Amino acid sequence: MSFIGEFKEFAMKGNVLDMAVGVVIGTAFGKIVSSLVGDIIMPIVGVITGGVNFTDLKITLKDAAQGVPAVTINYGNFIQTAVDFLIIAFCIFCVIKAINSLKRKPAEPEVAQPAAPAEDIVLLTQIRDLLKK
């Protein structure tokens, strides 16, 4: 099989296509959560904390000089990204937990009852017991 043929076979497998769909949906979900955090949650947290805008929080290491921008550590953006991550991680945890609860546990095989002995065996057992007496 040629290199291109092997690649087509690989690319058309169900797992690869499922993974591609998952990546696209995950990217879209990430954008939604980022918007939720940046546009809804963090402004509310900012109002609660006294009007703090988290995207403006930074430590200036070197001031701007002669057209060179200032060197800063933008820890406010980091806090916002950390909240973003926590929400996504919690959502993934909930989805995995729901999937695991929906999985059916394999039914335990029933223990087979031993078959009743045949009539001639029962009769022979009774004769043996009588002879022992």
Swiss-Prot record:
Q: What parts of the sequence cross the membrane? A: 10-30, 76-96
Q: What is its main location?
A: membrane
Q: Which domain of life is it from?
A: Bacteria
| Single Gene Ontology MF annotation | mechanosensitive monoatomic ion channel activity
Q: Where in the cell is it found?
A: Cell inner membrane
The job of this chain, per UniProt, is described as:
Channel that opens in response to stretch forces in the membrane lipid bilayer. May participate in the regulation of osmotic pressure changes within the cell.
Q: Which family does it belong to?
A: Belongs to the MscL family.
What name appears for this protein in its UniProt entry?
Large-conductance mechanosensitive channel
Organism of origin is Campylobacter curvus (strain 525.92)
